[in-house]
């Protein structure tokens, strides 16, 4: 059984960013909530949209920050502090340039890889990087100078379909993670590639 108590989906706020690659983490949390017939509601004290799920008999909070990406740690730290949730009880879903669309991977800890949302969360959790991550592949534009425009752009439908399929599999693997353990969830998710 997993000890995850908070699942966060990283995003930029507002309709103009809703369909951009950088919001893939929020797409995952929205899909997870939908699969349990829940919706997220804005809760200003946590600087985001929140919900509460019973996942495999465990009480789990969901959070999509309404801060800009580079301030995501403010929301995560507010909720973690209020509910006394430790970093290793947090799963952060985020877009990942180093994975192709259609692939998602779980991991514990590590650096921020240049991701400003992860960078701020690590900082606001007292420079503690030891939280779980769900890395949702969005691909890479091939040139570092094009990354900002790429993550703030909308994927073409062919890529969106692959990302959505990986997110659906990640939702199924989250249930395995909660019922069983991280290793079983990782083994299944890491074997998946949307085609």
UniProtKB/Swiss-Prot annotation:
PANTHER family (alphabetical): PEPTIDYL-TRNA HYDROLASE
Under Enzyme Commission nomenclature, its number is 3.1.1.29
Which class of enzymes does this protein belong to? hydrolase
Q: Reaction catalysed by this chain?
A: an N-acyl-L-alpha-aminoacyl-tRNA + H2O = an N-acyl-L-amino acid + a tRNA + H(+)
The protein in question is named Peptidyl-tRNA hydrolase
Which SUPFAM superfamilies does the protein's record reference?
A: Peptidyl-tRNA hydrolase-like (SSF53178)
InterPro entries associated with the record: Pept_tRNA_hydro, Pept_tRNA_hydro_CS, Pept_tRNA_hydro_sf
């Amino acid at each position: 059984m997993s000890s995850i108590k908070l699942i966060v989906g990283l995003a930029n706020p507002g309709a103009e960013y809703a369909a951009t690659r950088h919001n893939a983490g929020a797409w995952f949390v929205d899909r997870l909530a939908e699969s349990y017939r829940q919706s997220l509601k804005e809760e200003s004290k946590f600087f985001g949209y929140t919900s509460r799920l019973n996942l495999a008999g465990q009480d789990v909070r969901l959070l999509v920050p309404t801060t800009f990406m580079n301030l995501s740690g403010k929301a995560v730290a507010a909720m973690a502090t209020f509910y006394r949730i430790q970093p290793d009880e947090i799963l952060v879903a985020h877009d990942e340039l180093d994975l192709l669309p259609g692939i998602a991977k779980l991991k514990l800890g590590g650096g921020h890889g240049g991701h400003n949302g992860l960078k701020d969360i690590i900082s606001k959790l007292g420079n503690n990087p030891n939280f779980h991550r769900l890395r949702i592949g969005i691909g890479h534009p091939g040139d570092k100078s094009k990354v900002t425009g790429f993550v703030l752009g909308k994927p073409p439908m062919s890529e969106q379909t692959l990302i959505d399929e990986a997110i659906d599999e990640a939702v199924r693997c989250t249930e395995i993670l909660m019922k069983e353990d991280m290793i079983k969830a990782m083994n299944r998710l890491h074997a998946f590639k949307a085609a």
